[in-house]
Amino acid sequence: MNANGFSSLETEYIRKHHRHQPAENQCSSALVKHIKAPVHLVWSLVRRFDQPQKYKPFVSRCVVRGNLEIGSLREVDVKSGLPATTSTERLELLDDEEHILSVRIVGGDHRLRNYSSIISVHPEVIDGRPGTLVIESFVVDVPEGNTKDETCYFVEALIKCNLKSLADVSERLAVQDRTEPIDQM
């Protein structure tokens, strides 16, 4: 583990896929989640730019404009309880070979200005079974009246909820995939 708490492999993936150049008025961070489900299953959820609500608990609805290609826009409705109701997001990168998705927020009634995120999905072995390492990083402007620490803490809390939900949904699907019908006598 390094000073940030990442393993050498995690650090290498972050260096390779999660390059953000935060300006003076921005904060940036990366979070890691180990999921006990195969990479193809986790990626099948993450890559769905058109259906983030499959695992993101704060999304109630999503409408996509475009053909799910770079530059496509999605209008996301946010569930009540958060300081926003809508977010407009642009697909920046969708790489099915490297398993990388990047999204930029371009509008909405929230304070996340110049928000950009990258999520990468990597195969690993957990307890002798196929598992997945998920890394999500972001950069965002620090809103007027807030500190970098406050802003990072808020965004990290949202991402942690999303990653926990991604793990829950993926692991539930993985168990269903592994469950074989028992032969009746």
Where are the model-predicted features located?
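Hydrophobic ligand-binding cavity/cleft-lining segments
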Residues: M1-E69
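Short, highly charged C-terminal tails/helix-capping segments
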Residues: I14-K16, K164-M185
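Well-ordered beta-strand positions in beta-sheet-rich domains
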Residues: A30-H34, T86-R90, S116-S120, I135-S137
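Glycine-rich portal/gate segments that line the openings of hydrophobic small-molecule binding cavities
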Residues: H34, R47-R113, L173
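A short, structured loop/turn motif at beta-sheet edges
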Residues: V39-H40, N67, L93-H99, V121-L133
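Structural signal for hydrophobic/aromatic residues that build the beta-strand cores
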Residues: V42, V46, R74, L91, ...
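Short amphipathic alpha-helical segments embedded in low-complexity Lys/Glu-rich regions
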Residues: V59-V63, T151-C152, I182-Q184
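Beta-strand/loop substructures that line and gate deep hydrophobic ligand-binding cavities in soluble
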Residues: R104-C161
